[in-house]
Each structure stands twice: as C-alpha cells, then as structure tokens.
Amino acid sequence: MGMTIIEKILARKAGVAEVHAGEIVTVEVDMTVLIDLQFATMWMQPLMINDASKVAIVMDHAVPAPTIKDAAGGPNARKFANDYGIERFYDVGRHGICHQVIAENGLARPGEILACTDSHTCAGGAFNTAARGLGPAEVYSILCTGQTWFQASPTIRYELIGSMPAGVSGKDVFLYIADAFGDATNSNLEYGGPGLASIPLNDRRTIATQGAEISADFSTFAYDDVLAEHFDDLGITSYEPAHADPDAAYAAVREIDLSALAPYVARPGTVSRNGVSVDEVEPRKIDQAFIGSCANGQLDDLRIAAEILRGRRVAPGVRLIVTPASQQVYRDAMRLGYLQDIADAGAVITNSTCGACFGYHMGVVGPGEVCLTSSTRNFTGRMGSTEAEIYMASPATVAASAVAGHITDARKVVAQWLQVSL
C-alpha cells in the first residue's frame, strides 16, 4: 500500500520503510522554532540542547513588549541564544510573526519536519513540510534530544481543479472548505491536483495556516514548480521533497473546483460549518477592520489592500488596523508605496506582531463592537471582549468593507471604481 505525503515524511525521518495511519513513530526533527511567549512564562533554561543549528528563536507575539512580564522574557531569549550559539535569532527589529519568518528564511523545507509551540505551525505545510504545533514540554524534549513522536493520522486529500476567479483568494478557498466539510480533528490535510499550479504561494500559505482552525494535525501541500522556484530564489537546494504515491490510502478524497468559488465570510464563533457567501452578511455594519496575521499579513495581502484603498478613505466610525506579517514585509511594502496608500486612507499601520490577532494589544475590540478580520481565528473573545462579534474574510473583503463601512463584496465595490487587480 502506498503512502501519503505526511506518511512519506514520517517514514523517512523515522528511518523505516513505511508508515500508515494509526502507527506511532519516533522521528528526527529538522527545525524547532521558539517564540517570545515561551521565554516570558515559566521559562527554565535547559542544561543542554541537541543541535543549535536546528533551533530558531522568533520574537513575535508581544512586540514591542506591552507588559513588564513580556519585557522580562526578552533577556531570557537573548541569554539562551547567546549561551548555546543559536544563530537564527530574530530579535525585535529583525522579527516577524514566526510563520512569516520561517517562510522568508527557508526554515520549513520540502520533506522535512518542523516543530514550534505556536498552534499555527501547520503554516509550514505550504512548503511540503510536516509542520506541527506542539506543547512547551514536548518542544523542550526536542531541544534536548532532537526527536519527538507522532501517531500517523488518516489523511484527507483535497484534489484541486480549475483556477481561482478574480477577487477570490486562498482565504476564500479555506473558508469554503471549512464551511462545506467542517472539522478535520485527528486528520491530516493534503492539497494537490491540477488546480494547485494556479494558486500562488502566498495563498497556499493562507490555506495551510488555517488548517489549525479545523483541528487538522498536518496541513501539507504537494511539491511542484512553484515551490522549486521559491527555494531556488532563496538559494536553498539541499532538500528532498515528499510525493504521495499513486496508490496512497486516503480517508477521503474531495474535489474542489476553484473556478466555482466566490468570496466567503465566516460568521462569529467559528469557521467550521459557519461560512457564507459575502452577499449573505452584507451590509453588516463594522466598527473595526483588521488586515494582518500569519495567515494574511503577507506582502501580496498588503498590495491588494493598497490597491483597493488608494485614493479613498476609511468610512467614518470604522478603524482600519493593518499589521504586516514581518518587519521584512513592512520594509518591502514601504518601498513599494503600499503603506503610503494604506496610511493615506486613514488606516493605522503597526509594526509586525501577533498582538491584535489574539486580543493582546494593538487592535483589541470592545464590548458590542463588530470586527471584520483577515486574521486566523474568530471564536468568542479571541480579539478582545467576549461581547464583540468577529467576522473573518479575505484582505480584499476587509479593505473594501472598511471603505464602505459595512461588510461588502470587494468585486462589486471595485467595479464602481477604477480597475484593481484582485
């Protein structure tokens, strides 16, 4: 019996011929990523680490530190990096949301295993990587031993056909999947098929990242020319992609016709079986619009927002907050003029941080407020008050809605303006 992508990676890293659903294996971990929150809460420096070249540290969730407790974590992180000679240390100023930093620096590579304490680590699956969020205790163990264990879960295959229409993004693809099929608890997600070639890497990253919202174990994409070009651009050639066997056993194979999709919105509470076409929630008034996070704070997301906002103004009574996914994205967007267009429209642009996404700082919503976000989660209380409502949509939908003052279809709004390449 053949193997899926994840089964292939687990087998290779366990040093065995085959792995199939239900089996437990101990595997070598290629990269372990630590984030700032670990160093601010109950940090105890290990007495040894297995391999400093396989460790990275990223300051991301609480940057700049909004509390004394968070500020105290910084010295812990710097001491740890210095004591063990960890060169991949992305301190404040070089930082970004860890999954963006992982992408920019090629830390998630085809056919490899990456672990991190952040729940959205499945974002690395866009690179044909077995990327998984784990608890702090397990990550400590990996630091010391270089290994961890996994039980291989059944895999759901999404066979993509067609191509996304104008105005439809990876966010819409995910929201459709989450609504149509619901949770994927104790399952892996695998994306492939002829339609994959039409999905840009930034949209693949959005889809992979959001796998956490439907409780997937791994959320992994097939290796193709898009990934080959990406790693060539980074100057990285040392990797071995994993390809699913033709006779791989899947729990389900679901065909998604990308050309049939439209902009989607997840209603407050959850993304699972809770999405609708944007027309069904228009014209819900909003108080805050947010563009950012590891899922949708990438350079292309800011380009789309800038093109929609250029020459226009955010509606009275609406605050638009934009958070680039990394300081590198921030600098690139500044050089390209995107941030100028966004700021001129009346938006607030923050430094790179996870702050607003998890309701910590730089965009917390209050009681009775309605927020439309392109971030990762919309459960009650996620971005602040438990009495707030959080709708989730693509950056295009968020930007257009910020101008309209209510949730709206960006395609309709843009059609009334000059042409914008969504």
UniProtKB/Swiss-Prot annotation:
A molecular function annotated in GO for this UniProt entry is: metal ion binding
Query: What does the note accompanying the cofactor annotation read?
Result: Binds 1 [4Fe-4S] cluster per subunit.
Q: What keywords is this UniProt entry annotated with?
A: 4Fe-4S, Amino-acid biosynthesis, Branched-chain amino acid biosynthesis, Iron, Iron-sulfur, Leucine biosynthesis, Lyase, Metal-binding
Cofactor(s) this protein cannot do without: [4Fe-4S] cluster
**E.C. number(s) listed in UniProt:** 4.2.1.33
| Catalysis performed (reactions) | (2R,3S)-3-isopropylmalate = (2S)-2-isopropylmalate
Q: Which branch of life, at top level?
A: Bacteria
* Enzyme category, top tier: lyase
Coiled coil: which residue ranges? none
What Gene3D superfamilies does the record point to?
A: Aconitase, domain 3 (3.30.499.10)
Pfam families cross-referenced by the UniProt entry: Aconitase
What InterPro entries is this protein classified in? Answer: Acnase/IPM_dHydase_lsu_aba_1/3 (IPR015931), Acoase/IPM_deHydtase_lsu_aba (IPR001030), Aconitase_4Fe-4S_dom (IPR036008), HAcnase/IPMdehydase_lsu_prok (IPR011826), Homoacnase/IPMdehydase_lsu (IPR006251), IPM_dehydratase_rel_enz (IPR050067)
Which residues bind [4Fe-4S] cluster per the record? 294, 354, 357
Q: Which GO terms describe its biological process?
A: L-leucine biosynthetic process
Pathway-wise, it operates in: Amino-acid biosynthesis; L-leucine biosynthesis; L-leucine from 3-methyl-2-oxobutanoate: step 2/4
Oligomer status and interactors: Heterodimer of LeuC and LeuD.
Q: What is stated as this protein's family in its record?
A: Belongs to the aconitase/IPM isomerase family. LeuC type 2 subfamily.
This chain's function reads: Catalyzes the isomerization between 2-isopropylmalate and 3-isopropylmalate, via the formation of 2-isopropylmaleate.
- NCBIfam families this protein is in? hacA_fam (TIGR01343), PRK00402.1 (NF001614)
Query: What protein name does the entry list?
Result: 3-isopropylmalate dehydratase large subunit
- Organism classification, top ranks? Bacteria, Bacillati, Actinomycetota, Actinomycetes, Mycobacteriales
The coding gene here is leuC
